[in-house]
Amino acid sequence: MAARLCCQLDSARDVLLLRPFGPQSSGPSFPRPAAGSAASSASSPSPSDESDLPLGRLPACFASASGPCCLVFTCAELRTMDSTVNFVSWHANRQLGMPSKDLWTPYIKDQLLTKWEEGSIDPRLSIFVLGGCRHKCMRLL
């Protein structure tokens, strides 16, 4: 069975919480470095590598130019789990007018998280559940 994650942004601690969604929905949170925070040089990536940072423990297909696995990657608002939507289809509809599908990764990393942090994102994705796939997960930094 595919893993499901509940993703929430805790703006007070500047942490993106990724928790297993199910009977026991408690799990570790994975901190995302703040834009201006200073970290030790041994653990922080160089500025040139910053654009390649994975978003938590998401499947490798999530950052591909073609998007995540179409058949098993879904999202839904936590309160209305009966109305899940395919994340690739949802994103494709939002992407109409964008010149290239190669903008998938920058859109997710920059636009989606920026809107999320500013509180101006579509409420359907402010708290959402992502269905996993069979691809290997990207490693955490």
Swiss-Prot record:
Q: Give the UniProt record's GO annotations in the biological process aspect.
A: DNA-templated transcription; symbiont-mediated activation of host NF-kappaB cascade; symbiont-mediated arrest of host cell cycle during G2/M transition; viral genome replication
Keywords attached to this entry: Activation of host NF-kappa-B by virus, Activator, Apoptosis, Host cytoplasm, Host G2/M cell cycle arrest by virus, Host mitochondrion, Host nucleus, Host-virus interaction, Modulation of host cell cycle by virus, Transcription, Transcription regulation
**GO CC terms of this entry:** host cell mitochondrion; host cell nucleus
* Region forming the signal peptide: none
Superkingdom:
Viruses
- Post-translational modification note: A fraction may be phosphorylated in insect cells and HepG2 cells, a human hepatoblastoma cell line. Phosphorylated in vitro by host protein kinase C or mitogen-activated protein kinase. N-acetylated in insect cells.
Disordered, as annotated region: 24-52
Q: Where in the cell is it found?
A: Host cytoplasm; Host nucleus; Host mitochondrion
Q: Region annotation Mitochondrial targeting sequence: residue ranges?
A: 68-113
Residue ranges annotated as compositionally biased, kind Low complexity, are 24-48
Q: How does it assemble?
A: May form homodimer. May interact with host CEBPA, CFLAR, CREB1, DDB1, E4F1, HBXIP, HSPD1/HSP60, NFKBIA, POLR2E and SMAD4. Interacts with host SMC5-SMC6 complex and induces its degradation. Interacts with host TRPC4AP; leading to prevent ubiquitination of TRPC4AP. Interacts with host PLSCR1; this interaction promotes ubiquitination and degradation of HBx and impairs HBx-mediated cell proliferation.
Q: What family does the Swiss-Prot or TrEMBL record give for this protein?
A: Belongs to the orthohepadnavirus protein X family.
Role according to the record: Multifunctional protein that plays a role in silencing host antiviral defenses and promoting viral transcription. Does not seem to be essential for HBV infection. May be directly involved in development of cirrhosis and liver cancer (hepatocellular carcinoma). Most of cytosolic activities involve modulation of cytosolic calcium. The effect on apoptosis is controversial depending on the cell types in which the studies have been conducted. May induce apoptosis by localizing in mitochondria and causing loss of mitochondrial membrane potential.
Its protein name is Protein X
Q: What organism, scientifically named, is this protein from?
A: Woodchuck hepatitis B virus (isolate 7)
Q: What gene, per UniProt, encodes this protein?
A: X
